[in-house]
C-alpha cells in the first residue's frame, strides 16, 4: 500500500481541508495517510470525518511554518535538526523510508527549502525544480521550473532539461521526449 505523508497544517484554512482531503484519499484510493501537524487540532476533524478503520494516522508536530516565514527565520525552521514543524517532520518521515511521498499545500518556498535541508539533493543538481504536468491537446507536458527559481544560470536550465527528460521517459513512459525553453520575460 502506498504511504503518503500529508502536511495537515499547510493550507490557508488548515487543518480541516488537509485532513478531509486526506481521509477522502484513504477512502477512495486505498492509500495510507500519515498526517503531520498539531494533533490537538487534527484529531477532532479526523474524528468527525468518519475515518475509523481507515489507514490514517497522526504524527504530532506542534510547531508552525507559515506563509509569513521568510529569510533567516524560514531557513532556521527548515534546517534545525530538532525542528518540529509539520513540513520538517513530514520530510524526515519520508527520508527514513517510512513513506513514499510527501504532500503540502503550504508555502512553496518553505517546501523547497525544507526539502533541500531535510532530503538533500541529487549529486550534480544545483537546484531542485517544481515539475507539474500541464494538459495539452495530445496529453500532458512537464514544465520545469514553474517559478521557484526565477534567476537561473544556463547550467540550471540544462539540469532542468535533463531531469525533465528523465522523468518523462521513466515515469510517464515517453520515448525520446522533446526539451524546449520557455522564458518568463
Task: Show where each model-derived region lies.
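Short, charged/polar low-complexity linear motifs in solvent-exposed/disordered segments
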Residues: 33-34, 130, 160-161
Amino acid at each position: 500500500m502506498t504511504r503518503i505523508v500529508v502536511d495537515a497544517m499547510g493550507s490557508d484554512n488548515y487543518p480541516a481541508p488537509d485532513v478531509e482531503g486526506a481521509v477522502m484519499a484513504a477512502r477512495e484510493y486505498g492509500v495510507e495517510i500519515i498526517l503531520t501537524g498539531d494533533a490537538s487540532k487534527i484529531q477532532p476533524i479526523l474524528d468527525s470525518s468518519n475515518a475509523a478503520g481507515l489507514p490514517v494516522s497522526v504524527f504530532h508536530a506542534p510547531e508552525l511554518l507559515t506563509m509569513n516565514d521568510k529569510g533567516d527565520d524560514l531557513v532556521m525552521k527548515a534546517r534545525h535538526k530538532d525542528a518540529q514543524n509539520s513540513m520538517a517532520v513530514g520530510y524526515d518521515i519520508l527520508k527514513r523510508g517510512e513513506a513514499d511521498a510527501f504532500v503540502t499545500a503550504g508555502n512553496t518556498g518553505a517546501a523547497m527549502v525544507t526539502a533541500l535541508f531535510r532530503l538533500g539533493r541529487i549529486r550534480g543538481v544545483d537546484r531542485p525544480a517544481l515539475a507539474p504536468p500541464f494538459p495539452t491537446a495530445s496529453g500532458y507536458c512537464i514544465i520545469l521550473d514553474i517559478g521557484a527559481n526565477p534567476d537561473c544560470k544556463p547550467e540550471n536550465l540544462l539540469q532542468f532539461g535533463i531531469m525533465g527528460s528523465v522523468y518523462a521517459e521513466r515515469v510517464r513512459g515517453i520515448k525520446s521526449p522533446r526539451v524546449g525553453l520557455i522564458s518568463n520575460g
